[in-house]
Amino acid sequence: MSKLYPVGVQNFEGLIHDGYVYVDKTAQIYELFNTNKYYFLSRPRRFGKSLLLSTLEAYAQGKKELFKGLALEKLEKDWTVYPVLHLDLNTQKYDTPESLTNVLEENVQNWEVLYGASSSEIGVARRFQGIIRRACEQTGRRVVILIDEYDKPMLQAIGNEALQNEYRGTLKAFYGALKSMDGCIRFALLTGVTKFGKVSVFSDLNNLRDISMIDQYAEICGISEKEIYTYFEEDIHELAAATGMSYEEACAELKTNYDGYHFTENAIGMYNPFSLLNTFANRRFGSYWFETGTPTYLVELLKLHHYPIEELEHIVTSQPVLDSIDTASTDPIPVIYQSGYLTIKGYNKMFENYTLGFPNREVEQGFFKFLLPNYASVSVSKSPYQIQCFVEEVMAGKVDDFFERLKTMFADIPYELARDREVHYQNILYIIFKLMGFYVQVEYRTNRGRIDLVLQTQDYVYIMEFRLNGSADEALAQIREKGYAAPFAKDSRTVYKIGVNFSDELRNIQEVKVEMGQ
C-alpha cells in the first residue's frame, strides 16, 4: 500500500486512525502544555496550525492510544482528561457584523448542550465565561481552550475600518473571558496568521505568551530538513524518478521551492508542509501553497499606500514592527511578513534589526505573477503568456517587438492607479523584469527616477536605461558615459544599448533609442 499524505487533513485522530504519515511534533507539544498556561502562535496559512490544535485536543482528552509510538507516549505518565473548548474561526466568510456573531453563537450553543446554560448570562462573551466555569465545576478539571485562526474576521475586514472595529470589540470581549475565568483554565492556545497591535483583541490578556518568534518552538509547525530525511527519504527517490532528476537534484529543487521559512534569527529553515506533501503525493513540483489562497488584501495594501515593490527585496526592520499589525499604519510589511510572503533572512545583533526577503521560489514567483495583472494592463489569464513572450523576444533579439509589448502593459491604466506615476511605472517594470528573471539573467537598479537594467541571454546582452520625463537620447548618453557596456567588451554576444523615456503625460513609453555594439 502506498503512503498516505495528510494533504489538508487537520484532524489528528482521523489522521492516526486512517494511517496517514505524521511528522512527530509531540515532544514540543508536551513541553508547551506543561511549561506555561496562555499562548499565542502566529504562522502562515496552511502551515499546520489546525493539526497542532487538534493534536493538543486529543492529548488533553487523554486519548493515549492515538500517541502509540510517538514521543508523547513516553513523556506523559498521567493522561489526565480535561474538558476542551475548541473554537475554529476558519470556516466562515466574514463580511457583516452578524457573520462573526453567528459563528460564536453556534459554538456557544454547542458547548451549552454539554455544560448547561444560565438565563442570567446575556451575550456570547458572558455565556462563554459561564461555560468555562460550569465545565470546570462539573468535571472537576480545569478547562483547555483552543482557538484556531482567531484573526480570520479581522483579516477579512482589512480596508473596512468600521467592520474591523466591530469585530475587534466582539472578539476582545469574547477572549476577555480567559482572563476573568483564569482559575478555571488549565491551558489556552490561540493561533492565527497575524497579530494585531494597538487596541488589540489581546489587550486584556497581559499574561499571553507569544511564542511566534521563540527558538524553543520554531519547529512546532512546518517540516525541517532533518524531518524530511527521517520521514520522506523514500519519497524523495520516487519524486526524483518521476521527474527525471537525480536524488541530489530533487533535494535541491525541494529546498529552492519550499524551504526558507525562518521564524527567529537563529532558527533553521522550515519547509512549507502543504506544498511539500502535495509534491510527494503528486510526484511533481508545483505552486501548491500559493494557488490555495491569493494575497488580494496584501496587494490592496501595497497599491493603497503606493508602495515601491522593489523595496520588498531588501527590507530592514525591528521585532516590534514584525510582532504586531496596526490597522491605522501605512506600512504593509508586518501583514506581508506575518502572512508568510516574507521571512527572516538575517539579523543584526548590534542594531537588533531583521533583514527580510521571500522565503523560496514558490512564494516569490507566485507573488510577482499575482502582482502583474493587478498593476499592468493585462488580464489574469494572459499574464503568464505575456511573460513567456517577453522572454522569447529577448532570447531572439527582437528588440522592437519587446518594447511594443511593453507599451501595451502601460496602456489603459486608470488614472487612480497611475496617480503616483513614478512609483507606478517603476513597479510595473520591476514586476515584469522580476518575472523574466526566473528565466534569464536580470540585474535591476533604481536611482532618482532612473532605472538601470542589464538583461543577459545566451546570445544577447541588453543594457537599458529608463528615464521619466527626460529623453531617450539622455538615457543612451548615460549608458555611454558610465561605461555600462565595458564589462562586455570581449563578450561574443550581441550587445544592445537602449535608452527609454517614459512620459508622465502619456502615462506610457514615449521614445526608445537603440544602439548596437560595445
How would you name each of these model-derived features?
Residues 135-139, 432-458:
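Active-site metal-binding core of divalent-cation-utilizing nuclease and nuclease-like domains
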Residues 144, 460-462, 496:
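Structural motif
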Residues 164-169, 468-485:
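Mg2+/Mn2+-dependent nuclease catalytic core
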Residues 429, 451-468, 482:
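Conserved catalytic cores of phosphodiester-cleaving nucleases, focusing on short active-site segments
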Residues 487, 491-518:
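Domain-level recognition of nuclease-like catalytic cores that cleave nucleotide substrates
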Residues 174-181, 334-342, 430-434, 478-498:
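Metal-dependent nuclease catalytic cores in nucleic-acid-processing enzymes
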